[in-house]
Every structure is written in C-alpha cells, then in structure tokens.
C-alpha cells in the first residue's frame, strides 16, 4: 500500500518499501519494478502521501535500493566480482539506482546497506538517489564450516526472527547447508533449539526497516 485508499481507511506515518530495482524502463514512469506496476498512479500516490498524510506534514516512504552491485548480465561483464579492477581496489558496480524507474522519483528516502565494519555491504547498489545507509550486513557464513575466510561471505549478517520451527523459514530452507552453527536446521544450537531465529538475514531489505525504525523513534520524540 502506498497509503491511498487503504483497507479500513487506516494510513501509516511511515511506509517501509523493502524491494529492489528493475530494468524494464530506465527513464520515465512505465514498466514494472518487482511486482509493482509503475506508472503515473504510483507517482501520484507517493506525491499525495508526502503532501497530505500526517496532517499535512507528509508520509515518509523508506525504500531499499537493491542488492545488484555484483549482478552482471553476463560472465564477461567488467563489474562487481568480475571486474578487472578488483585487485587494485577500484571495483565498479554492475548497476546504479537511477537505472530503476521507481528510484527516479523524489518522494522516498532511499537506503543502501552497510555491514559490521561500517562500510558499504558488498552487494549494495550505489547511485545518486541514496540518502542514507542502514544495517544490512554480509552473508554470515562461518569460516569453520566453509572456505570463506577473508571473503565477503564471512562477514556477519543480521540476526532476526524466522518462521517458527526447524522446517520453515530461512533456517528450514537451508537446512541441508546452514551458513553457521546458529542456523542448525536440526535445532542443535542451544540458543536456537526451536529454529525461531536466523543469523544470516541481509540485504537492503534489512537496511531499510532499520532506518524506518529510527525514523519512527525520531517522530515519537518530535512529531512535528
């Protein structure tokens, strides 16, 4: 929901939009972004929200920018992990936020991801529309279980709740090859015996709600 004609007429002050970017149309407002049809209706809805919600102070739309830094269209693309500049430390992104139609709209606070080292997460899509970064982490693989020492896969990810039970959610889906001992799909970790938590969540879809939560606290302290 963009906050226009919501069920029951109930609107929110803050909308977290945790989905990334698409490539159907680089410019204008046609095409599709994820499962959301983009057109004048979307632009009008966002504009209405920022002009009318919160008693005229405006709704706040917090949007994840995507995880496409390393997403190449072919194996020969000189970007991300495939970039010949990796060794010199000048890695080029495979895309930027402005190539997504929805990220060309001015009505959102767009959020990139950073990790525990307080630098950009390896996957986070860069671009001129990024306002701020939130915590997205890396991939949470254990170097004791996998040969990932010193790579992006070893960096800690985000700890969060999961679907209950060891056959459900992220833990259940990866039970055959859990990233670390906490994600043991047999319930073998004493602090996660019911598999209700996962320690390998990541992405700008994690970063955006972390920022949305901070924004909520700011509005609680200063609603005007």
What are these regions (language model features)?
Residues 218-224:
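Phosphate-handling active-site elements
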Residues 91-216:
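Extracellular S/T/G-rich loop segment that most often corresponds to the catalytic His/Ser-adjacent loop
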Residues 1-105, 117, 191-210, 221:
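Substrate-binding/access-modulating region of protease and related hydrolase catalytic domains
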């Amino acid at each position: 929901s963009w906050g226009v004609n919501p069920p029951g007429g109930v609107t929110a002050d803050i909308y977290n939009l945790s989905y990334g970017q698409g490539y159907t149309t680089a410019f204008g407002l046609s095409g599709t972004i994820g499962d959301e049809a983009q057109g004048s209706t979307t632009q009008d809805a966002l504009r209405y929200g920022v002009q009318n919600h919160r008693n005229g102070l405006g709704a706040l739309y917090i949007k994840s920018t995507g995880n496409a830094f390393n997403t190449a269209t072919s194996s020969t693309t000189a970007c991300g992990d495939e970039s010949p500049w990796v060794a010199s430390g000048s890695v080029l992104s495979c895309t930027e936020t402005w190539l997504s139609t929805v990220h060309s709209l001015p009505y959102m606070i767009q959020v990139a991801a950073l990790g525990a080292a307080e630098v950009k997460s390896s996957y986070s899509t860069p671009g001129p529309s990024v306002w701020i970064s939130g915590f997205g982490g890396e991939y949470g693989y254990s170097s004791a279980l996998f040969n990932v020492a010193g790579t992006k896969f070893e960096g800690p990810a985000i700890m969060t709740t999961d679907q209950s039970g060891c056959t459900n959610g992220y833990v259940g889906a990866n039970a055959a090859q859990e990233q670390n001992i906490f994600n043991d799909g047999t319930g073998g970790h004493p602090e996660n015996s019911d598999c209700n938590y996962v320690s390998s969540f990541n992405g700008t879809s994690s970063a955006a709600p972390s920022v949305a939560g901070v924004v909520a606290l700011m509005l609680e302290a200063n609603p005007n």
